[in-house]
Regions:
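Short, low-complexity, polar/charged sequence segments that are solvent-exposed and flexible
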Residues: 54-56, 139, 226
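Short aromatic-cysteine micro-motif
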Residues: 1-113
C-alpha cells in the first residue's frame, strides 16, 4: 500500500519495483476511491495555479522545489515527506528555514508536486512510432499500460522535440488537458519542460515534476519518454483520492 508518512523518504525504484502499474496497484490497495495521480488531476492543479497566479510557472510563483542538489549517482536523494505540513493547505517553501531549491515546496497542500522525485502520471498512454499520438483514459474503462483499449485518442500529438513547453493541443472533449505539442529553447512561455522519444517503436508512459537535480526544468515538467516497465531511484508515485459519488 502506498502511504504518505511524515519524516520518511518517498518510495522509489531503487529498492522496489515501482513501475507505473505497480504504483497503481499500491494506491488501489488503500481502498475504494484511491488511485494513482493522473493526467486529469494534474490538469485541475494547473488550472488552479494559472487562475491564482496568472502563470503556469510554478517554480517562479511558489518556489523552486527540491531541484538544486548535486547527484551522488547511486541513492534516492529525495528529501523526507512532511516538511511543509505547517503550511496546511497554503502554498510556499518549507517554513522551517528552508533554502529555496533544496527544500520542499507545497502548492495548496500538495507537497513536492514538482522537484524532489519523479512521480508516475496515470491515465495517459503515448503511442510513439514517429507520431507520439496521445490517448487518455475513458471513464468506466480499465486503466492499463501499453494499450488503446478503453482510451480515447486526442486530436493532437505530444511534442516531437525536447524543450520548454510553448504550445498546447486542444481536444473538444478534453479542453482541460494541457499537453504540450511544441517546445522551444525559451522558458518564458510556461517555465515547464517537456521530454519525448517519438521515434520509439511502441507505447510510452508519462512522469511528472522532475527530480532533485532537475533545476529550472522542474515544475509541471512532463516526461513522455519512459516505457511502462521502467523503474529508477528517482522514480516514485503519488496517490489520489476520488470521492465515490453515486448518481441516481
Amino acid at each position: 500500500m502506498l502511504s504518505s508518512i511524515a519524516g520518511a523518504k518517498p518510495a522509489s525504484g531503487l529498492t522496489q519495483n515501482l513501475t507505473r502499474a505497480n504504483v497503481r496497484k499500491l494506491c488501489a490497495n488503500r481502498g475504494a476511491g484511491w488511485e494513482s495521480h493522473s493526467i486529469f488531476a494534474m490538469a485541475v492543479t494547473e488550472w488552479l495555479l494559472m487562475i491564482e497566479y496568472a502563470s503556469l510557472d510554478a517554480q517562479r510563483k511558489v518556489g523552486r522545489g527540491v531541484c538544486d542538489f548535486t547527484d551522488d549517482g547511486k541513492t534516492n536523494m529525495a528529501v523526507v515527506t512532511g516538511a511543509t505540513s505547517g503550511l496546511g493547505n497554503g502554498s510556499g517553501i518549507d517554513p522551517n528555514g528552508g533554502v529555496d531549491g533544496k527544500c520542499s515546496v507545497s502548492y495548496r497542500g500538495e507537497e513536492n508536486l514538482w522537484g524532489n522525485i519523479w512521480t508516475w502520471l496515470d491515465k495517459v498512454n503515448i503511442l510513439a512510432k514517429g507520431q507520439n499520438e496521445v490517448f487518455v483514459h475513458e471513464i468506466g474503462a480499465t486503466v492499463a499500460d501499453d494499450t488503446t483499449t478503453g482510451y480515447k485518442s486526442l486530436g493532437y500529438h505530444w511534442s516531437h522535440s525536447n524543450g520548454y513547453q510553448s504550445a498546447f493541443g486542444i481536444d473538444p472533449e478534453h479542453p482541460e488537458l494541457l499537453i504540450p505539442t511544441e517546445a522551444s529553447g525559451s522558458d518564458v512561455f510556461t517555465g515547464n519542460y517537456v521530454w519525448q522519444n517519438y521515434t520509439y517503436n511502441g507505447f510510452l508512459v508519462a512522469r511528472l515534476g522532475g527530480e532533485w537535480i532537475g533545476g529550472s526544468s522542474c515544475g509541471f515538467y512532463l516526461y513522455g519518454g519512459s516505457t511502462s516497465g521502467s523503474r529508477n531511484r528517482d522514480f516514485g508515485g503519488r496517490w489520489l483520492y476520488v470521492p465515490q459519488t453515486k448518481v441516481a
